[in-house]
Amino acid sequence: MAATSQVLTAIARRLEGKVALITGGASGIGETTAKLFSQHGAKVAIADVQDELGHSVVEAIGTSNSTYIHCDVTNEDGVKNAVDNTVSTYGKLDIMFSNAGISDPNRPRIIDNEKADFERVFSVNVTGVFLCMKHAARVMIPARSGNIISTASLSSTMGGGSSHAYCGSKHAVLGLTRNLAVELGQFGIRVNCLSPFGLPTALGKKFSGIKNEEEFENVINFAGNLKGPKFNVEDVANAALYLASDEAKYVSGHNLFIDGGFSVCNSVIKVFQYPDS
């Protein structure tokens, strides 16, 4: 009975023997995903600039299954070091989850936007993703296998939901994802991105101006298309787990929406009307 239980446990681990590097892994989506990947058997390297939080995540996961690397994704040497450190520690890199991202102050008029803010967002959200892709590919191409996932956004395919800098940067993430999927397919490397709905992470709260988590969730639930289930960061982590696992072995170049159908809605033309029950 115990042997059967152990076998079932091993089968349930969808990333057994895999090694993952997660940028922005010290909080929010990255932290939750790091913990989930570890639960599914992966060794996880957490890269971030939030050192104290990063070390706390490693302590929560366990030092035998995770490590923390200080990494500013806008610095190529830092990204290169994070990749090399991961390979040196665990022997390989199977999964690169490029998740680090920022936003700028929410100024609705472009004439009020600052060039410095725009460049800062692109530096992290676009250049950072590019560097993670580049250095992941550097070690994955010789192995002829690997999996690169990036965090995009609903703003990767629609306008009006975020600042110009953030929207433009996430469109760029999707473009990089599709282009790299074409290049790296010949090596058996999959490249995908995730586009989540609004979440009460530090980034989401900062951009929306809503600090109270319950209030944030209520706003999202009211605005959302799919009523009933509450959207949370675990939903995004589970989507990342799917893309990272062999269950998605033939999925590449895909932008996976975790938005309850919001991105396909037309909020102006409302054909489907039910009387209040």
Curated annotation (Swiss-Prot):
Keyword tags: NAD, Oxidoreductase
EC number: 1.1.1.331
Binding residues for NAD(+): G24, G25, A26, S27, G28, I29, D48, V73, N99, K170
Tagged with keyword Zinc-finger: no
GO molecular-function term, one example from the UniProt record: secoisolariciresinol dehydrogenase activity
GO biological process: lignan biosynthetic process
Matches recorded under InterPro entries: NAD(P)-bd_dom_sf, Sc_DH/Rdtase_CS, SDR_fam
Pfam families reported for this sequence: adh_short_C2
Keyword NAD attributed: yes
Swiss-Prot/TrEMBL catalytic activity: (-)-secoisolariciresinol + 2 NAD(+) = (-)-matairesinol + 2 NADH + 2 H(+)
Coiled-coil residue windows: none
Catalytic residue positions: Y166 (proton donor/acceptor)
Binding positions for substrate per the UniProt entry: S163
Record note on quaternary structure: Homotetramer.
Protein purpose: Oxidoreductase involved in lignan biosynthesis. Catalyzes the stereospecific conversion of (-)-secoisolariciresinol to (-)-matairesinol via a lactol intermediate.
Homology family: Belongs to the short-chain dehydrogenases/reductases (SDR) family.
The protein's name in its UniProt record: Secoisolariciresinol dehydrogenase
Organism: Forsythia intermedia
Lineage: Eukaryota, Viridiplantae, Streptophyta, Embryophyta, Tracheophyta
